[in-house]
């Protein structure tokens, strides 16, 4: 907007020469790309009952439109619940649910050419007119061939082309339900026989007509199914013995779990737009896999109470799982003591109304994935003289794989004060996770590359606090109730495992990665340490610079992904038939490496690259940029070297620490305004028992983020979508894990109107 004229992608061409046109900004070009999404929910429910039966059936439909063009999702659901009483000894209940979820196009995520935001959030300057790209994305030449109209083709496609021609459809059908038969021979003994089924099948079809990665087309089709069957037999006891009360159960469970997946595809097509295996150019992609596992379990639980003042509970469970050779047993114990019942003198209506102490200890075991404990052979697609070939696995079968173990103990206190207007619940817990199943490298002389072993020990300790108070309480007037939830968890990696190749204890285990930044579990550190290129510091803690540029090294610890604490603060106000409430969420800490911030700074599309006359005066670290930090040369001199802004930001991404931001935030999570219709009005209808109307909003505002979050990215919208077809049902992109962000979609603010009527 300073009077420049430059040849541009959409400038007229005269005699083969692209002409210069005004170099001007396109106001709101990013804002105009997004559209107002919508979600419409419709539910109809019917219920009927007699003295021996009760039934409820419901139908629901949800229609959603995305905030980007040509994205949608529809959800259909049916549910039936019925209960029958044959006589005083026998009851029967049944529940069945069916859900279908489908979409013609789910948007891609992450650093991926299927993500339309990759181009917009990293490469599009303000000069790009998105309206022009929208109007011409399907432009063809005189031969009817697509021109792939775009302002530049070096790294990305026109985002409207991506959303309209490179689509990801999804269709899933799920059925789940259970049925139970109850037999009650006495008033204190009951038996239950229960069967439950959960099944789904889904299809995900990803197609690329053209993009930078696949100029000759691409497709993947995955058909996946899962079936889980559970059968339980349980005996319940509920018996009082004078001042003592016993509640208990004992049961057995049979579980069968199966998954299957079939996939086809091609990385290149012979004929454009024909997404079939027969049209694959070269060897097509095929996948056919399945998993089966079964388990048998016995379990029991007993709770004993004395005079409604003291309680003790014990639970035991033993599992035999097909994925682990040996059975595993895990118990738990807990107890609570209501002091105000034991010592009534403690109760004072004006101060203390209720006081309870509680504590518990538990051990939990978990098995592993199928086929890890034994050797198995994989099919080779080719054959030899008509004979099917198999190959030996590269993973050495473990000799004695044990289940993972989690041991936890907890103590807590609950209190009601000031005529039950103040409620406090506080707890401290300690958790140790050990025998984690990890994939460790082995010497190549064994003929294998790795093996699964039991290793690792992680300790967690934390505090959870809830404080709720009726600040103003007036049954006939204004009321105000506020609730604060606060939680802090501190983790520590105590040990990993001894490397079978080197014989040395391992001090770091990679969890995830994004570009050159890796997330490690490191011994002695909290879970999730980001490692990458980072600053070199002087002895006094200042950052070392040379010629105005920070000196950096690889392999530096540049972040901790674990938040320091989380909090939520809710308020509910009511006055007669009106009520209003809102919820604030707060997170402190939790570092995130942002690819958006790295490349958005390199290309100059982020606001901070042009603030403070940096373009005109250059970047002087510590003076007009990153003024919260101190930069010094090796001889201790304060940095005063101005670096050309274009040169500085072009190399911004090479120092990964510059793109790590503190994930702290304050959010207005939700709010609602409700009106309850008075009974005096409803009585006139003679059929409506209750009715209310509510205006609701969710994810309403990101009120504050840490100053290091210069791209103002929602820390909760970080993308972790993977290539797994079931994961990819909601997002496509690379799976970088916790602590990474790449081209994430801006958070969506939603508003809704709810009408509830009870007949």
Residue ranges and their predicted role:
Residues 20-22, 213-216:
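Flexible, solvent-exposed loop segments that connect beta-strands
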Residues 17-19, 30, 321, 589-687, ...:
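Extracytoplasmic gating/loop element in the C-terminal half of outer-membrane beta-barrel translocons
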Residues 11, 40, 75-77, 81-90, ...:
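Extracellular/periplasmic, surface-exposed regions of secreted and cell-surface proteins
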Residues 1-69, 106-112, 120, 127-130, ...:
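Residues embedded in well-ordered regular secondary structure
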Residues 33-34, 41-63, 67, 79-85, ...:
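Predominantly transmembrane beta-strands of Gram-negative outer membrane beta-barrel pores used
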Residues 23-29, 284, 550-554:
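Short Pro/Gly-enriched beta-strand edge/turn motifs at strand-loop
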Residues 1-21, 453, 470-561, 592, ...:
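Conserved small-residue
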Residues 560-595:
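Glycine-rich, aromatic-lined ligand/substrate-binding cores of catalytic
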């Amino acid at each position: 907007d300073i009077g420049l004229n430059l040849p541009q992608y959409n400038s007229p061409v005269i005699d083969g020469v692209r002409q210069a046109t005004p170099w001007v900004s396109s106001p709101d070009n990013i804002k105009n790309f997004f559209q107002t999404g919508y979600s419409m929910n419709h539910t109809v429910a019917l219920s009927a009952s007699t003295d021996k039966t009760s039934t409820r059936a419901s139908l629901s439909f949800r229609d959603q439109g995305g905030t980007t063009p040509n994205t949608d999702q529809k959800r259909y659901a049916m549910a039936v619940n019925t209960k029958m009483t044959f006589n005083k000894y026998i009851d029967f209940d049944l529940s069945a649910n069916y859900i279908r979820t489908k979409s013609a196009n789910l948007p891609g995520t992450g650093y991926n050419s299927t993500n339309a935001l990759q181009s917009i959030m990293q490469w599009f300057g303000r000069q790009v007119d998105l309206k022009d790209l929208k109007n011409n994305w399907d432009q063809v030449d005189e031969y009817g061939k697509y021109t792939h109209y775009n302002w530049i083709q070096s790294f990305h496609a026109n985002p409207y082309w991506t959303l309209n021609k490179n689509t990801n459809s999804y269709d899933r059908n799920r059925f789940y339900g259970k049925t139970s038969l109850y037999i009650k021979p006495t008033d204190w003994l009951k038996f239950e026989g229960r069967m439950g089924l959960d099944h789904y099948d889904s299809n995900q079809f990803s197609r690329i007509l053209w993009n930078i990665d696949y100029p000759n087309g691409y497709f993947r089709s995955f058909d996946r199914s899962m079936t889980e069957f559970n059968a339980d037999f349980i005996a319940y006891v509920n018996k009082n013995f004078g001042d003592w009360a016993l509640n208990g159960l004992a049961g057995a469970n049979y579980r069968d779990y199966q998954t299957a997946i079939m996939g086809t595809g091609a990385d290149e097509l012979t004929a454009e737009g024909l997404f079939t295996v027969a049209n694959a150019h070269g060897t097509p992609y095929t996948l056919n896999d399945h998993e089966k596992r079964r388990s048998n379990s016995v379990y029991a639980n007993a709770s004993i109470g004395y005079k409604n003042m003291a309680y003790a509970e014990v639970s035991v469970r033993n599992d035999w799982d097909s994925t682990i050779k040996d059975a595993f047993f895990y118990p738990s114990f807990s107890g609570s003591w209501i002091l105000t019942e034991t010592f009534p003198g403690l109760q004072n209506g004006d101060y203390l109304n209720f006081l309870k102490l509680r504590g518990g200890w538990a051990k939990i075991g978990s098995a592993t994935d199928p086929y890890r404990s034994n050797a198995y052979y994989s099919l080779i697609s080719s054959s030899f003289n008509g004979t099917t070939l198999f190959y030996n696995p590269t993973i050495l079968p473990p000799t004695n794989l044990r289940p993972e173990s989690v041991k936890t103990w907890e103590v807590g206190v609950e209190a009601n004060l000031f005529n039950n207007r103040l409620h406090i619940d506080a707890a401290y817990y300690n958790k140790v996770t050990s025998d984690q199943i990890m994939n460790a490298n082995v010497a190549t002389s064994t003929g294998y590359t790795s093996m699964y072993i039991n290793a690792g020990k992680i300790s967690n300790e934390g505090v959870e606090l809830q404080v709720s108070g009726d600040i103003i309480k007036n049954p006939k007037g204004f009321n105000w109730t506020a609730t604060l939830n606060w939680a802090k968890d501190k983790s520590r990696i105590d040990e990993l495992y001894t490397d079978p190749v080197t014989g040395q204890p391992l001090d770091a285990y990679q969890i995830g990665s994004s570009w050159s930044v890796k997330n490690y579990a490191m011994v002695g550190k909290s879970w999730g340490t980001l490692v990458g290129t980072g600053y070199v510091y002087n002895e006094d803690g200042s950052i070392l610079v040379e010629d105005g540029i920070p000196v950096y090294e690889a392999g530096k610890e540049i972040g901790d992904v674990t938040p320091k604490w989380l909090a939520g603060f809710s308020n509910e106000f009511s006055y007669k038939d009106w009520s209003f409430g809102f919820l604030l969420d707060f997170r402190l800490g939790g570092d995130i490496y942002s690819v958006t911030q790295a490349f958005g700074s390199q290309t100059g599309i982020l606001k901070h690259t042009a603030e403070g006359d940096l373009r005109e005066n250059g970047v002087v670290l510590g003076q007009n940029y990153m003024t919260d930090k101190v930069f010094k040369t090796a001889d201790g001199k304060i940095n005063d070297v101005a670096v050309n802004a274009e040169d500085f930001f072009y190399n911004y991404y090479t120092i990964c620490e510059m793109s790590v931001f503190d994930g702290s935030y304050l959010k207005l999570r939700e709010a609602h305004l409700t009106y309850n219709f008075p009974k005096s009005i409803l009585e006139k209808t003679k059929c409506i028992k209750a009715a209310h109307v509510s205006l609701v909003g969710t994810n309403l505002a990101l009120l504050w983020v840490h100053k290091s979050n210069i791209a103002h990215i929602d820390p909760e919208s970080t993308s972790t979508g993977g290539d797994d077809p079931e994961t990819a049902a909601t997002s496509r992109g690379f799976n970088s894990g916790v602590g990474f962000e790449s081209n994430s979609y801006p958070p969506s603010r939603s508003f809704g109107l709810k009408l509830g009527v009870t007949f």
